[in-house]
């Protein structure tokens, strides 16, 4: 998952990737991805070198709830605002995401935003044809277990 940070005034953009391991069993179930997303948000804001009274707008997505609570504790309620990300920040984050998945060898369907189901099955078929890439798939969602491809995937247990 790509997390982006954008400063409108200067058009600065930074991003980082939330490791897929947080979206697999057992980490997914314990929601470790929330803490990691929060850490990435703080790292990105540090790289942007926030001004003393600069407002911070954060995507309304659930994954940022923990980050927002920590930001409010650190900067105060008045500086933090939840928003629907659109425009240039959305475009740049989407480009970063596309670059990351293309680096894995996957070419997404062109109309992926309009046809989410088609996009999902396109990616699932790509994984079926490239099983070595399953290590990059977010397999923690219980509903994915209805698909044979994900039922048969058992990640190696590692200590991290």
Q: What kind of region is each of these model predictions?
A:
Residues 1-160:
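RNase H-like, Mg2+-dependent phosphodiesterase core
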């Amino acid at each position: 998952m790509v997390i982006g940070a954008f400063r409108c005034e200067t058009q600065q953009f930074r991003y980082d990737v939330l490791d897929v391991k947080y979206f697999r069993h057992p980490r997914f179930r314990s929601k470790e991805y929330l803490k990691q997303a929060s850490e990435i948000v703080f790292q990105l804001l540090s790289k942007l070198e926030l001004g003393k009274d600069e407002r911070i707008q954060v995507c309304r997505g659930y994954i940022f709830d923990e980050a927002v609570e920590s930001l409010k504790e650190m900067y105060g309620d008045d500086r933090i605002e939840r928003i629907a990300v659109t425009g240039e920040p959305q475009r740049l984050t989407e480009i970063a995401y596309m670059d990351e998945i293309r680096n894995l060898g996957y070419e997404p369907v062109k109309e992926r935003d309009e046809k989410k189901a088609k996009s999902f099955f396109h990616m699932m078929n790509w994984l079926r044809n490239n099983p070595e890439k399953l290590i990059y798939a977010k397999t923690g969602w219980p509903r994915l277990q209805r698909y044979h491809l994900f039922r048969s995937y058992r990640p190696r247990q590692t200590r991290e």
